[in-house]
Amino acid sequence: MKYIVVTGGVMSGLGKGITIASIGRNLKNKGYKVTAIKIDPYINIDAGTMSPYQHGEVFVLRDGGEVDLDLGNYERFLDTELTRDHNITTGKVYQEVIAKERRGDYLGKTVQIIPHITNEIKNKIRKVAARSGADVCLIEIGGTVGDIESMPFLEAVRQMHREEPSENIVFIHVTLVMEDLQGEQKTKPTQHSVKELRALGLSPEVIVTRSKTPLQESAKEKIALFCDVPQELVISAHDAGDIYEVPLEIEEQGLTTQLMKHLRLESGVDDGGWREMVARMKSTTDEVKLAIVGKYTNLEDSYLSILEAVKHGGIDNACRVEVNMVEAETLEEDLVEVEKLKQYDGILIPGGFGGRGTEGKMLAIKFARENDIPFLGICLGMQLAVIEFARNVANLENANSTEFDEDTPYPVIDILPEQTGVADMGGTMRLGDYDAILKEGSFATKLYGTNYIVERHRHRYEVNPEFVDRLESFGIVFSGKNKNRMEIAEIPGKRFFFASQFHPEFKSRPGRPSPPFKGLVRAMCKYRKEREVQ
């Protein structure tokens, strides 16, 4: 097994995840099987109970793992499926070590950070890498060098560097290069960051610099000199027009070739597929506008996978999608804001929790339904579409979800039976892959091209089966089901009115878009052309 370990310095949020994903993509383009592990030094077991304002969206894996959004980037770039074990947290490590201590696995010994915690970290890394069957395992250590939380993980990979043959492991350090008022790039923070890393016994073979503009030759020379790395291994990861251009950006600087040389991997022929996809993305001329009506609109990372899936749909339809975030509560406060939705070619209601903003979202759904604007609802978006339909079409006044109103006379959305009495919040929802059978001749079947699908889920509430027949008698169709669970709702005769209990965005890939997003953008393009003719 070959390991590529990526650390970060100067500050967090530099883009280590995109760096890892881009390196992995380039190695995959050369014919190698690649997997990736994200190490998060927080004490949480997983990301499931974190606010989107803390870490952005919670990405859901096929096995139900609720993880950091970086793993979503890994899956999209590498076109692979990961598991919950690919996300190692301090919480998981300590939980396992304490469980072993209680079982008596360390009987007679004092349990310590070294060797017990560090050994557990190494064991987790090696087990995941081995099970994946990959040629190369990429490891991202979250946070910044110098953070107290990261120390056990840095010590663990230091030990791995000592234990593995030198041709089996390489260290990459990602740092920030800032510019002063005169535009000169300053390398001191990078130098100090590498110095701090070396004090921990780690010497990076490659330095990747994040900057607004391409790294100047003088700055590259200075970093190479003071950080003791060859100049050709100081890589500029400057801001790109789109994250999917980053693999090409670092490939052109020879990083993949240098890594393969260090790891003694035979050079393969690039199939060119990624480059072609990026070229298609950049050559789009048509443009449509999409409104995402949500409650976490101040932080776009809250809806990262949705934004990427929309982009994938745009690439496939040779159309650029301009996305505007609309705060749901503003629609509740001023109906004039609702009318402004007519400027959009499509409306999307994403998933979420809690009652804040739900009435505003339903106003947006009603506007889309009545004005036949292409609409996509996801998870909570589907539940609200059903509530809106129940109230305004099926004459079920004050219909609601028991999540928001336990005393509603028409609980068209109710808690999952197995969730009743569940007290713990973490990892207890209906999570991960579940299948659905699609109704023959439905729009959903046409969209997917099959009557059997598997998609990822994250929810506690569902459409109440007691109201399905009554709602369908008024025209809505539940065209996808998992046994007696409603997975898809659609309204026939509309340009595009599709809502899913599952999260299709989590399985969307560049070059292979999720069918609902591909269909939404296609409908938006058609709607835009119809409006232009009028």
UniProtKB/Swiss-Prot annotation:
Reactions catalysed: UTP + L-glutamine + ATP + H2O = CTP + L-glutamate + ADP + phosphate + 2 H(+); L-glutamine + H2O = L-glutamate + NH4(+); UTP + NH4(+) + ATP = CTP + ADP + phosphate + 2 H(+)
Pathway(s) served: Pyrimidine metabolism; CTP biosynthesis via de novo pathway; CTP from UDP: step 2/2
Binding annotation for Mg(2+): 70, 140
Residues reported in the UniProt entry to bind ATP: 13-18, 70
Residues the record marks as active site: 379 (nucleophile), 503, 505
Residues noted as binding L-glutamine in the record, renumbered to the chain: 53, 352, 380-383, 403, 460
Mechanisms controlling activity: Allosterically activated by GTP, when glutamine is the substrate; GTP has no effect on the reaction when ammonia is the substrate. The allosteric effector GTP functions by stabilizing the protein conformation that binds the tetrahedral intermediate(s) formed during glutamine hydrolysis. Inhibited by the product CTP, via allosteric rather than competitive inhibition.
One Pfam family, short name: CTP_synth_N
Keyword Transmembrane found: no
GO molecular function, one term: identical protein binding
Positions bound to CTP: 12, 147-149, 186-191, 222
Note from the entry: CTPSs have evolved a hybrid strategy for distinguishing between UTP and CTP. The overlapping regions of the product feedback inhibitory and substrate sites recognize a common feature in both compounds, the triphosphate moiety. To differentiate isosteric substrate and product pyrimidine rings, an additional pocket far from the expected kinase/ligase catalytic site, specifically recognizes the cytosine and ribose portions of the product inhibitor.
Family: Belongs to the CTP synthase family.
Name of the protein in question: CTP synthase
Source organism of this protein record: Methanosarcina mazei (strain ATCC BAA-159 / DSM 3647 / Goe1 / Go1 / JCM 11833 / OCM 88)
